[in-house]
Amino acid sequence: MIGKLKGILEHVFDDHIIVDVQGVGYVVFISNRLRPSLPALGESLSLFIETHVREEAIRLFGFVAKAEQEWFCLLQNVPGVGAKVALAILGTLSPDELAQAIALNDIAMISRAPGVGKKVSERIVSELKSKALPFNDNALHFTPQPHLEVTHQPTNDALSALVKLGFERDQAARALALAMNALEGETVSSALLIRHSLKLLSPST
């Protein structure tokens, strides 16, 4: 099994690249998010590799971050999600954004990925709610998402309330995701979510 490749970027195609490692060219499939960060042809790069062995072929999938590779594997535990769908999701959402979407039951956010419909998105949230990898909670500020649609009603109400209190929508959503994780297993109301979120959003913390 190949776990990591370090070599020279030789060719770039629509869905894969060729990495030259000491004269051997490896075909590595990548997500759309990785393409803009690729080095120039002829320059070196290092990728975490997930190897899929099938009767007809051996396929290598490359990721810059270990978290992306872990999510790639985790997503494929969901019925109906194969390598192609998992890669499409990771090509649309970062690991942090995906973890946030699952924590917030945000079906619409996951459905933004090409070829991922509502039913698959609902299955991902349902199956991975208790297994999802944690996202980076060191900072509540993150890249804004223009179409954040929360489908869990108490969370939706809490989000609206926090926005009315003057917090940025994306900042409030991140705090709510942390609150949802902390309150897992409890009966969650919008008031309870608001209280927990305000503690996270308070300047004193």
Curated annotation (Swiss-Prot):
Annotated region described as Flexible linker, given as residue ranges: 144-149
Q: Name its GO BP terms in alphabetical order.
A: DNA recombination; DNA repair
Q: What is its main location?
A: cytoplasm
Q: Name one GO molecular function term.
A: four-way junction helicase activity
Which portions of the sequence form the region Domain I?
Answer: 1-64
Question: Which positions, given as ranges, span the membrane?
Answer: none
- Specify the protein name: Holliday junction branch migration complex subunit RuvA
Q: Which organism is it from?
A: Bartonella quintana (strain Toulouse)
Q: Which gene encodes it?
A: ruvA
